[in-house]
Amino acid sequence: MGTTVKKHEIDMLHGSIWNKLPLFALPVAATAILEQLFHASDVAIVGNFTGDARTVAVAAVGANGPIIGLIVNLFIGIALGANVVIANAIGCRDDNAVKRAVHTAIVFAVCGGAAVALLGQLIASPLLSILNVPEDVFPYALLYLRIYLLGMPVILLYNFEAAIFRSIGDTKVPLAALAISGVLNVLLNLFFVIVLHMTVNGVAIATVAANAVSAALLYIRLTRTDKCVRVERKALRIDGASLKRILSIGLPAGVQSAVFSFANIVIQSAINTLGTVAIAASSAAFNVEILAYDVLNSFSQACTTFVGQNYGAGQIKRCKKTMQLSFLEGAIATFVSVVVLLLSARSLLAIFNSDPEVIAIGYIRLATILPAYVFCLIYEILSGYLRGFGISLAPALLTMLGVCGIRIAWVKFVFPTSMTFQTVMWVYPISLGATAMLILCAVLIYRPSRRFAGLETEEEDK
């Protein structure tokens, strides 16, 4: 396989890390932000073009958020495991290990997606019942969920393919594929809903079709690349050792994300008791604040991948330098995004809801949570640093304790004593701060740069 680095790929093993981190991270952030915007377009279209059914249609799409989030986040975590395993193998210059991991990831994504699709048809109705979806919304929500779950093979395939591209330092190809499929998604939404007069079924079909296109585009690119991650149909099989390694790193990260989603469902249940205005305000604010999270999380993903390759290459000092620069550059990017969002908060909130009361309450959420993203940056970068070394269980358990444990306990014991929106919001900086301290302690205890110092090669970062 070819070893030259193309313009859209990043050489993580040599040269300046300072210049390369943002080249990796910013397309990842743009991809996540585009996904948010395309999802918002789904809601906007059913909310404006489904006539008398628009209220239940919007509610049906929203009601499925927690379920879809749990499933997709679980597998995105596993895809991160594939990213690390492939990056390690690339750093070791072990093309055979890369080949086994790549083909294992592709097959696992399709088979895992098929299993979820089939199981989902059986448990979709009970899951929606657990969430207490209103009777008038239930049939629409069930229809949307069943169609969406049928598309899980292609949805998961895209995420695993994107992880493969990122492992070689290519974040632009997944972004381009998503942009193409996203535009197609919007066009299909308009066609199905306006022309064919469909409701949530049209939006769900459009989403699945668009994901199929993005997955197909990346698959074709992988079959034609001259890099070591090239996919060959005859080699598509699961390698037991590769799968075990992928799951050992990815499953804790996936479970962490899934439990994280569950904790947020608990918080949402508390917000739901405060009335329609609070619900609308919180929803609008979330759509604003997630943009800053996408920015900081992109540097965490960059840190994981850079550390993964350099750890595989035995360049341990470069791993530590990657973590330090990820902090610095991530802090700069996060600070800028937080300041911009806070200064334009009321205008951005008005895009989702122009009610002055909704905007006022939404601003409370933004003013409380966005400054606390300094803690989020700390634990995301440090978690990414540990995962790059293959240490995944510890950050997952500590995040579950710090984020999930505190949030669930807060809603159960603190919120009942002062049932206000601000009381609910205080749990975010408290839980994020506690988690940051826990992860920092874990890094100080593990000290990966010292633990793996014996693997250091003669090749030094110039």
Regions found by a protein language model. Name each.
Residues 12-44, 48-52, 66-81, 85, ...:
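N-terminal transmembrane alpha-helices
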Residues 40-44, 118, 126, 160-164, ...:
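Alpha-helical transmembrane segments of multipass membrane proteins
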Residues 23-42, 147, 181, 210-214, ...:
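Transmembrane helical elements of multi-pass membrane transporters/channels
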Residues 76-79, 148-166, 174-182, 203-218, ...:
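Short runs within selected transmembrane alpha-helices of multi-pass transporters and secretion channels
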Residues 33, 37-59, 128-135, 191-198, ...:
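Helix-terminus/linker motif at the lipid-water interface of multi-pass membrane proteins
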Residues 55-66, 141, 145, 204, ...:
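Small-residue hotspots at the loop-to-helix junctions and early N-terminal turns
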Residues 58-118, 155-174, 268, 279-345, ...:
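Small-residue-rich hydrophobic transmembrane alpha-helices
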